[in-house]
From Swiss-Prot:
It comes from Xanthomonas oryzae pv. oryzae (strain KACC10331 / KXO85). The keyword Cell division does not apply. Residues 170-274, 310-390, 468-500, 653-870, 982-1011 form a coiled coil. This is Chromosome partition protein Smc. Signal peptide: none annotated. The keyword ATP-binding applies. Homodimer. GO terms for cellular component: chromosome; cytoplasm.
């Protein structure tokens, strides 16, 4: 394989499309410094995949695009194309059948870069893979740039090793090893994650096993409690039925008494209605008298205000008259001064206007002269540009024709060679076989893709279903956690309240408790536990009862009076537990309390008020011996006041008892909800396990389908690329053959025409030189005349502008003064008018004030009369109000009695309803527990005590609380976790097996790499030892390994020129280093010759003798390797079979000029 053509367009200084043909194996590029020779080497490196801007001598990759020059604009993109002759099939694989391979790269200003392989767009990696193992690449040993020859010899051992690896062809092994290491790393990461999961599952299994055993015990206790609780509720239901019968009889008696109170109340209401009519008539008389008083008082105030206003008005008028006279005098002075200024300004404007007109005429004359001079100069400039354009066109035409002649000659030779190569390549392309293989792969791909679509939809559906179940499970788990948290908080609160309640009710006093226990009363209820108080009145009841709140409820307290003598110390109160639905006064505290009748009677003569003010008012109207109490416990009686404040432990016992009952109800509700949620979670876990298994199965099938589709897609893309490349190549060959035939016919004709045009252009340029000198002399004369006219016009214009500015300023002042005088004349007229008005008002005098004084005295007399009439009307109204209050008090008493009776009846009905509701709740609870109420009641003995069953339920609850918190789902969770553990163990085994396979692959790659590297090292070392004496005319050089491990050991080179003993390569001279590096590079080429070698001024540090040795070596190796070198040395140029010159006649733009030395020599010999 060899490089046949390099095409550049827009790359660095090669802005125009440029083609460099390389027909021989020894091509030299020559030219002056800075003309762009090294840009050709950069172009080859760039198109082969170089991605570092610094290695291309730029700051960014877009710097390779031509950025413009003094005569050219920047271009938008750069393109480089390499065409390889692959007739020896050096490139294997899918491109082995192509005799010609094209590699192209394009980059635009927006940074987009694209690669093309045989006209088909591809990746950068495809280009890199194409040249793997050939010794070619953007940074391979086949491209040696300026200064790089010394860098090779001074490189670190690790960097020098890279060249040997490329020569050994193990770069592809390193790439595979890197991919395998990445897969091993991912596998180990998966193993680590899997190990963490297995460790966590193991911990969960031990924990869940303990929870499962605890859950089984808890469920057994739940079943036992369900039976006992149903029996306990059935016993309570049986007791409630007897209470309902007695309550109905008492309700009938209360309704009869209510009818009597209502009749007496209606009689009092009729008397009140008659009194209200009389009161309304009296109230109207009082309102009329009051209105008369208000009317007279208003008139009196108005007269007094008018008198004060008249006096203030007279003072303001005197002050305004004095101010107006002062302003009129000052305004007259201003008018006189401004009139004088206005006359002076008008005279100055009249004198300046003729002068300005004269300057304008002079300025117009000067401007006309300047325009004529500039027109003559513009005419000359047009002729000058025409001359320059003619000269440039003639010069460019000559250069173009000269270049064209050279190009057309080379084009004819190249077209004939390419025609022969294209014919041979077309014969080797089999398009039908490639197309048939493509159709087979495409059919398999479409079939697998259809299956993949179905599997994808199935996986998505199962993921969606699994996500919905997980979301529902999380919501239920969150709600369950919250319910448990609320229940735990409620139990803690209940325990605290019960402890406080025991202390508040005196259940912790030692002597009293012992006395009660000796009589079987230690578990008897306390007063605070059995009374119900209207909300807000708890403090008042506690203050009123005092120590009685701790009283023990017994059936007959009088029977225990004698036994109280046995109480050694402490205190105790015994209260009858009997209850009664007796009605009490609505204002009494007893009306706000439900409980033992003894407590209610104690509170019957204690009335209630919202606050102290209301209490004081109510206390004055109470019968003797009654007292009143507020919500806060402040108590007032006749001649005494008492405030009782309980300690922290005693305070709020009644309110606390209500909270205890509410908490017990709340806990029962939460426990029911907890059981429902646990059952719901168990169902979700079963569904999730099944859904997860289904999703994993579908995911596994989808993965296998994806893998199959990807492999087929890769095969399809590869085969499509082959078909497209072959088809494109055939079309291109046909087109190229047709074009080549036309090119051969037209090139000779165009060459004859170009030579004739070149002679005409040279003649024309001689004629134009004389015209140029005459035009330059005329330009100097016209420029001087134009400058004189411009200076004269500028002086006149400046004087005219100065005078115009002065005149405009004076006119502005005249207009301003005129407006000011008009405004001040108007103000003076207004001041005269105002002064006359003020004098007229002052002349009227003080006559209105005397009239107002007389009206004031009459109004005072009228006010005395109306106030006397108002007093008489109010006396009559007070008498009627006294009678109404008496009637109202009578009606209110009957109303209160009726209200109290209604409340008693309502309370009876509420008690009845409460008993019915309690019975229904008990019945519903038994049915909910799964029992029939009648069967449970009939199955219980008559002597059964509900308290015993309640205690049994409490004991079971205690055993259950000791087990809490309990995870009832632990039984199922334990089974699920065990299945998950088995699945993870299987995955762990699969991953370990895959890891062993990958590690074996690494070991195999390492063995192959070591063998290839050792063989290459030995052969290159032998080559260096043979080539070094030839290049130096003696001496000795060899390679050394820096380490023992052939996988990563570095490589150093040791050299000793003839007659020298050096200990380090750094002690060599620049030329010696260059020759040593050349020996190394050529030794590598002998082992694994790259298709071509690019040398950029490697002979720069060498003397003439060494240059000759280098040239001979290059000439000898060119039999197998194609060389393209850049040089300024004549001896190196002489070794070349073809020289291509790079010129930069146009600044910033490089062009090629090619010469075939053999052809030139042959033509010279023939002549």
């Amino acid at each position: 394989m060899r490089l046949s053509t390099i095409k550049l367009s827009g790359f660095k200084s090669f802005v125009d499309p440029t083609t460099l043909h390389l027909p021989t194996n020894m091509t030299g590029i020559v030219g002056p410094n800075g003309c762009g020779k090294s840009n050709i080497i950069d172009a080859v490196r760039w198109v082969m995949g170089e991605s570092s801007a610094s290695r291309l001598r730029g700051d960014s990759l877009t710097d390779v695009i031509f950025s413009g020059s003094s005569a050219r604009k920047p271009v938008s993109q750069a393109t480089v194309e390499l065409i390889f002759d692959n007739s020896d099939h050096t490139i294997s694989g899918e491109f082995a059948s192509f005799n010609e391979i094209s590699v192209k790269r394009l980059v635009s200003r927006d940074g987009n870069s694209a690669y093309y392989l045989n006209g088909t767009k591809c990746r950068r990696r495809d280009i890199t893979d194409l040249f793997l193992g050939t010794g070619l690449g953007p940074r391979s040993y086949s491209i040696i740039e300026q200064g790089m020859i010394s860098q090779i010899i001074e490189a670190r051992p690790e960097d020098l090793r890279v060249y040997l690896e490329e020569a050994a062809g193990i770069s592809k092994y390193k790439e595979r090893r890197k991919e395998t290491e990445t897969r091993i790393r991912h596998t180990r990461e998966n193993l680590d994650r899997l190990g963490d999961l297995r460790e966590e599952i193991t911990k969960q299994l031990a924990h869940l096993q303990r929870q499962a055993r605890q859950a089984e015990q808890y469920q057994a206790l739940q079943e036992e409690r369900r039976i006992k609780d149903a029996e306990w509720k059935a016993l309570e239901y049986r007791g409630l039925d007897g209470q309902l019968q007695g309550l109905r009889e008492k309700l009938n008696q209360e309704e009869t008494r209510l009818q009597q109170f209502i009749a007496e109340q209606r009689d009092a209401e009729a008397r009140i209605e008659t009194g209200r009519v009389r009161r309304e008539e009296s109230a109207e008389a009082v309102a009329k008298a009051q209105a008369d008083v208000y009317q007279v008082g208003g008139a009196l105030a108005r007269i007094e205000q008018q008198i004060q206003h008249q006096r203030e008005l007279s003072h303001r008028l005197h002050k305004a008259r004095d101010e107006a006279q002062s302003q009129l005098q000052e305004l007259t002075q201003h008018i006189s001064g401004d009139s004088a200024k206005l006359s002076v300004l008008r005279e100055a404007v009249a004198a300046a206007e003729p002068q300005l007109e004269q300057l304008r005429e002079d300025h117009e004359f000067r401007q006309e002269s300047l325009r004529e001079a500039e027109a003559r100069l513009a005419d000359w400039q047009q002729r000058w540009e025409t001359h320059n354009r003619d000269t440039g066109e003639a010069s460019r035409a000559g250069e173009v024709e000269r270049t064209r002649v050279d190009y057309l000659d080379r084009q004819a030779l190249e077209a004939d060679r390419r025609r022969e190569a294209l014919v041979n390549e077309r014969a080797g392309l089999d398009l039908d076989a490639l197309a048939e293989a493509f159709e087979q792969i495409e059919l398999r791909h479409e079939t697998q893709k259809t299956s993949l679509d179905g599997l994808t939809e199935q996986v998505e559906a199962r993921k969606h279903a699994l996500g919905g179940l997980q979301e529902q499970q999380r919501a239920s788990q969150g709600e369950l956690a919250e319910v448990r948290k609320q229940a735990q908080a409620a139990r803690g609160r209940l325990s605290s309240l019960e402890t406080l309640q025991q202390a508040a009710l005196g259940q912790e006093q030692g002597a009293a408790v012992a006395w009660l226990k000796s009589r079987g009363l230690d578990s008897a209820a306390r007063v605070g536990e059995r009374i119900s108080v209207q909300s807000g009145w708890e403090n008042a009841v506690e203050g009123a009862l005092g120590q009685l709140i701790e009283g023990v409820l017994v059936d007959a307290p009088e029977q225990l009076v004698d036994a109280l003598g046995e109480l050694g110390d402490g205190r105790i109160a015994l209260v009858s537990s009997a209850t009664d639905n007796a009605n009490f006064a609505p204002t009494s505290l007893a009306a706000k309390v439900q409980g033992p009748i003894a407590i209610r009677r104690l509170l019957a003569r204690l009335h209630t008020a919202e606050d102290l003010d209301a209490a004081r008012t109510l206390q004055r109207s109470l019968p003797e011996g009654d007292s009143v109490i507020t919500r806060n416990g402040e108590r007032l009686g006749e001649g005494w006041v008492r405030v009782s404040r309980s300690g922290a432990a005693k305070q709020g016992a009644l309110l606390r008892e209500r909270q205890i009952q509410e908490l017990r109800t709340q806990i029962e509700t939460l426990q029911e909800r907890e059981a429902e949620l646990e059952h719901q979670l168990a169902s979700f876990r079963e569904q999730l396990l099944a859904a997860e298994q289904q999703r994993e199965d579908a995911q596994r099938q989808l993965y296998m389908a994806h893998r199959s589709v990807s492999e087929l897609a890769g095969q399809l893309q590869s085969q499509q690329g082959k078909v497209d490349a072959a088809r494109t190549r055939i079309e291109r060959i046909e087109t190229d053959l047709s074009q080549l035939l036309e090119t051969l016919d037209t090139s000779r004709e165009q060459a004859r025409e170009a030579r004739a045009k070149l002679e005409d252009a040279v003649t024309l340029m001689g004629d134009l030189q004389g015209t140029r000198e005459a035009l330059e002399s005329e330009r100097r004369q016209l420029t001087d005349a134009r400058d004189q006219a411009r200076d004269a016009a500028r002086g006149v214009r400046d004087a005219m502008h100065a005078l115009a500015l002065t005149l405009e300023s004076q006119r502005t002042q005249i207009a301003s003064l005129s407006q000011t005088l008009e405004r001040m004349d108007s103000q003076r007229g207004q001041l005269d008018t105002r002064l006359e008005d003020l004098v007229a008002q002052l002349s009227e005098g003080d006559s209105p004030v005397e009239t107002l004084e007389h009206e004031h005295q009459a109004a005072l007399s009228e006010r005395v009369r109306t106030e006397r009439a108002l007093g008489e009307a109010r006396t009559l109204l007070d008498s009627i109000d006294s009678e109404l209050r008496s009637f109202e008090q009578t009606r209110q008493q009957r109303d209160e009695q009726a209200l109290a009776q209604r409340e008693r009846i309502s309370q009876r009905k509420l008690d009845q309803q409460a008993l019915v509701l309690s019975a229904e709740q008990l019945s519903a609870a038994v049915v909910k527990a799964g029992f029939v109420l009648e069967d449970v009641v009939n199955g219980l003995p008559e002597s059964a005590n509900p308290a015993e069953w309640e205690a049994t339920v409490g004991q079971i609850d205690g055993r259950m609380r000791r087990l809490e918190p309990v995870n009832l789902a632990a039984i199922q969770e334990y089974g699920e976790a065990a299945q998950r553990s088995e699945y993870l163990d299987a995955q762990n085994l699969d991953l370990n097996t895959a890891l062993e396979t990958l590690e074996e692959a690494i070991r195999k790659i390492d063995r192959e790499t070591r063998g290839r590297f050792k063989d290459t090292f030995d052969r290159v070392n032998s080559g260096v030892q043979a080539l070094y004496p030839r290049l130096f005319g003696g001496g000795h050089a060899y390679l050394e390994l820096t380490g023992e491990d052939l996988l990563d050991t570095g490589v150093t080179i040791m050299a000793r020129p003839p007659g020298k003993r050096v200990s380090s390569i750094s002690l060599l001279s620049g030329g010696e280093k260059a020759m040593t590096a050349v020996a190394l590079v050529f030794a590598i080429f002998q082992l694994n010759p790259a298709p071509f070698c690019l040398l950029d001024e490697v002979d720069a540090p060498l003397d003439e003798a060494n240059v000759g040795r280098l040239a001979n070596m290059v000439r000898e190796m060119s039999e197998k390797v194609q060389f393209l070198f850049v040089s300024h040395n004549k001896a190196t140029m002489e070794a070349a079979r073809q020289l291509s010159g790079v010129t930069m006649r146009e600044p910033g733009v490089s062009r090629l000029v090619s010469v075939d030395l053999e052809e030139a020599a042959r033509l010279a010999g023939a002549a």
